[in-house]
């Protein structure tokens, strides 16, 4: 795993992926990702209907995390082609004590191990570079794929929680 701490937006590189800080040019990609049925079902409907909505979401929700905490969601792209396939990163939620690893991969790229590869790299980066002692994961109770992924990452079910904006109940893994 290569870590780049310069102004270059590339943060992590794995065998098959590059994770970088998103830019405003990623608005179209974010619009596509956040309107997939799986994202809406298991994460939330963020109400993004236009590229302008997605650009606003980047400015108001994604970019401020970098300014406040030094980390956030990264654009996940295929190393060979630069094709964006998802997002993965670290989130500090007001309602959780620990930092949360989050991930979402476009449906057409699911089942290839990309989410695990990205999330494992992000968690390693969080622990070794950012000095985070605890990283947790949160998912919907019926999201079996994410539950298996969190378990594969070494996290275990801790308890049920309520996260505002994420449905009535979520599962916390730690």
List where the protein language model places each region:
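Conserved GNAT-fold acetyl-CoA-binding loop/helix
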Residues: 38-60
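Acyl-donor (CoA/ACP) binding surface of acyl/acetyltransferases
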Residues: 1-42, 75-174
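PAS/LOV-family and closely related PAS-like sensory domains
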Residues: 52, 64-67, 156
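A short helix-loop-beta-strand connector motif used in the catalytic cores of GNAT acetyltransferases and
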Residues: 62-75
């Amino acid at each position: 795993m290569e870590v780049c701490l310069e102004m270059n937006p590339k943060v992590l590189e794995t065998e098959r992926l590059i994770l970088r800080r998103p830019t405003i040019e990623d608005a179209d990609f974010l619009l596509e990702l956040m309107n997939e049925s799986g994202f809406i079902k298991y994460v939330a409907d963020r109400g993004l209907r236009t590229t302008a909505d997605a650009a606003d979401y980047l400015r108001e929700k994604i970019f401020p995390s970098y300014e406040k905490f030094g980390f956030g969601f990264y654009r996940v792209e295929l190393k060979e082609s630069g094709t964006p396939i998802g997002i993965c990163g670290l989130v500090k939620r007001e309602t959780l004590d620990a930092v949360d690893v989050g991930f979402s991969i476009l449906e057409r790229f699911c089942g290839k191990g990309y989410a695990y590869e990205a999330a494992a790299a992000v968690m390693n980066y969080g622990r070794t570079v950012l000095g985070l002692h605890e990283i947790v994961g949160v998912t919907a109770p019926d999201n079996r794929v994410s539950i298996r992924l969190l378990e594969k990452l070494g996290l275990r079910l801790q308890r049920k929680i309520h996260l505002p904006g994420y449905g009535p109940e979520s599962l916390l893994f730690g």
